[in-house]
């Protein structure tokens, strides 16, 4: 599937010392979304004590979640390929299956002490190298940017995960030069990142924030159906691209659901 995701506006820098900062990704008219993500100084504890002990994600849990992703992508590969046959090359499901099988092989090669950020960056590079079309660089960039945002920590709490989702969405938008409303992967990922970050900033637990994010991702995916494609091979179809789900938006939902803990 060759899909490019339009340029994005430069995001304003966070105010030093602020608890929450807001960034915006440029969107098509009617698709305004702000990204709210907790910002903490190094060593600062979360404001809500419950977040310190609930829903901590370490490298082992990330590894397990990627095995779930591989299984989920394999189960949905034929459907993703059928969707892509309408708007793209008809290979999206097969390409993603190849990529996440390669990721599972990578997990067996990496040392057990690999940090979460290092693990995510390695996964991103493997996806770039193994997934055909544009979806490899797009998904790969999302994982790489999330890994950079994770830093050198051994455990990720909900505020950190919110920041990582925001970084993933921003990185994918930059790499694909896409905006919300272009009928791309971003239509699913950006609402998920926004909703998770807002929920955590409002004091939700990680599990509750994940449920909110998945609901927003599902709505975002469905919202790609009436859109006219502005990027990728579907662009050539013009108005005829409307009425079909974007295959990248669908695969993103599959991946997010698996990452959230549903096999």
Roles of regions detected by a PLM:
Residues 1-263:
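N-terminal loops that bind phosphate or other acidic moieties
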């Amino acid at each position: 599937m060759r899909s490019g995701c339009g340029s994005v506006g430069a995001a304003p820098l966070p105010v030093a010392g602020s608890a929450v900062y807001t960034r915006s990704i440029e969107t098509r008219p009617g698709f305004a979304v702000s990204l709210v993500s907790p910002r903490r100084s190094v060593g600062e504890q979360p404001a809500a004590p419950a977040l310190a002990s609930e829903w901590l994600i370490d490298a082992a849990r990330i590894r397990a979640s990627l095995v779930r992703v591989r299984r989920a992508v394999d189960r949905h590969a034929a459907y993703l390929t059928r969707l892509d046959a309408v708007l793209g090359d008809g290979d999206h499901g097969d390409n993603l299956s190849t990529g996440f099988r390669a990721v599972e092989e990578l997990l067996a090669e990496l040392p057990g002490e690999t940090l979460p950020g290092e693990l995510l960056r390695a996964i991103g590079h493997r996806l770039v190298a193994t997934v055909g079309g544009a979806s490899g660089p797009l998904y790969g960039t999302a994982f790489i940017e999330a890994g950079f945002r994770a830093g050198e920590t051994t455990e990720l709490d909900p505020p950190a995960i919110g920041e990582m989702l925001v970084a993933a969405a921003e990185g994918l938008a930059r790499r694909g030069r896409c905006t919300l409303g272009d009928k791309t992967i971003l239509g699913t990922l950006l609402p998920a990142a926004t909703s998770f970050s807002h929920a955590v900033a409002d004091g939700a637990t990680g599990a509750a924030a994940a449920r909110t994010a998945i609901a927003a991702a599902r709505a975002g995916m469905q919202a790609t159906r009436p859109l006219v494609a502005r990027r990728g091979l579907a662009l050539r179809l013009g108005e005829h691209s409307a009425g079909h789900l974007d295959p990248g938006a669908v695969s993103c939902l599959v991946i997010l659901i698996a990452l959230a803990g549903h096999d």
